[in-house]
Structures are given as structure tokens and as C-alpha cells.
Amino acid sequence: DNLDVPASLWQILHQLKASGYKVGTLPESQEALLDMMQERGVNLPRDVGELEKMSGLVQLMSAEDYSNWFAQLPASVRQEMEQGPFGLLHQQLSSAIAVGKPHLAKDALDHTLEEMHHLLEGVDHKGRERALALLAKLESCYLAAIQSTDALVCMAQAPSIIDALQSTGIEGLGGWGAAPGKVMTYKGELLLPGLIFGNIFVGPQPPRGWEINEELLHANLAFPPTHQYLAFYHYLRNRFNADALVHLGRHSTYEFLPRRSVGLSEDDYSRIVAGDLPGIYPYIVDGVGEGIQAKRRGLAVMVDHLTPPLASTPLYDELLQLRQLIESFEASHGSGS
């Protein structure tokens, strides 16, 4: 929040160098560092031309490398990554109903549908209304299965509704497909943007999705991250062999990934991402609540920074004209015209 990341990063790198850390050759200025980041440290949408250009500038991970690592993850994680939140939900409900635990099925249903309702209600997509209608239909179907003695019939109807939901074209509802997916891939390799300065890797945290507003995904606890997201941290931990992770400034997203809030296990995404690596997290001092989340789920040690001094400035030029137009529109709308 309001942290000048390039300037802060510049200062941190030079302090590390002064302390004896191997940081290689640093750029001459903050502006030069920012230019390097914009060239080699940016995640891109599915633009083949731009991905081709970047593929020769950044770290790459082969599909084989990632797939071999991915295959070692818990089955429920692999299923959710490949089939999306509804694929996992169907498996959870089927298992709970089969062993006579309807309350567990209801808990799983409530959790997933709450998160998916929030996402779909906010998404800007032509298939939004149809997706919401299908979600309501799926909820009715699953509730009937949980409450009915003839659950098999109800559960048999759910997959066709899930297929219809996934066919709306809203990103991620059907998962990210078989590893390594399609996000940030070029010719079968995953692209991992970033810069290497000696023993320091500096890179942007991958987004949790592309087409959906990042704010809707930031703390969504039912929507799995992309394959590239997991590959990024797999690279840092197991290929770059980092000794610690530094997430510079609020907000990261790894502490808000799906699954448990406390008592994390091997199938929790935050644990998959952070593993046993210490986390160092420069964090604005007024973000105590979310900072605790990062400590609990991300093994983070918080390093507080003060809120920066800010000043309000008056609007000018086109911004002033825009405000006047907005005020005129609001006034006319309020008068019923």
C-alpha cells in the first residue's frame, strides 16, 4: 500500500551489497532498474508474439520438469488445478454422502458456493447471468442430493450442470487444464519473468488469473492459482534454491490461496507455495489483520514500514471536466430525469 517498490527495491539491493551479499552488477539507477523490470519482469496475457520475445529473456521451466513436480502433489490439489473448483466440490460431496456425512457435504457446498457467488456477481463477462443461473441450479441439485435418500440420481445430474458452467467461457471455472496449462507458456515451456542479481532473484508474483478482475480473485478461497503460479515458487525453492522469500509490500496473494485458514497441511496451497522457506514481508504498519494471515499461512516475519506522507491535490484540466460531467449526471439521475 503506497510503497514505492522500485525505490525500496533499489535501496534493499544496495544494502545487501554493502552487507557482503553477492548481488552481482546492479543497475545504475532506480529508473534503470524499473526499465529492466518492465522488459524482463512482467507477466503477460496470451499474446504469442510478446511471449516469443520474452522467452529469450527470462527463466524457463520445461513442461516435463513442472509436470514431474506437479505429479507429486496431493490428488485433490491436482484435481482442483486441472478441473477447477467444481471438480473438487463434486468429489468432496460424493465422498461425504457415500460415508453418511451430510453435514460435511453441506459445509463444503456452502464454502465453495459463497466464494463462487462473490466472483460471478462481480465478473464482467457476457456469460455472467447464465453462469449465475447455472450456479443456482447446481446448488439446488446438490442440496437435493444431500437431503435425499436417492442421492445417486441427484449427483448424476450435477456433472452436466458443471459442464454447462464451464462452457460459459468464464476463465478458470473449468480449472487450468493438464500441466503445464496455457498461461505464460510458449512452445511447451513455462515463462518465469524476473531478474537475477548474483544470489538474488527479483520477479513479479504471478497473477491468479487474467480475464477476471484481480480484486475478485485476490482473497478467493475456492479458485485455484494457475500452473505458472505454482511453477514460479517451485522454481524459487527447488531450482534457484532460495534460502528465503521476500514479498515486498502488501498485498501478496499467497497467504490468501484456497484451503485451511489454520492448521495447514500438505494440500493447502499456501503451504505448497511457501513450503518451509522463511518469509520476509515488509508490510505497512496499519495492515495488522492481514499481516497476521501472512504469518499464520505463509511463515512470514513481518517488517513493518510507516504509512507514507500523502497530500490531496486539486483536480485539473480534463479531470476537472470529468468531475463536472459526473456531478451533472448524478444530479440529473437523482431528479428522476
Residue ranges of predicted features:
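Ligand/cofactor-recognition surfaces for anionic moieties
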Residues: 1-337
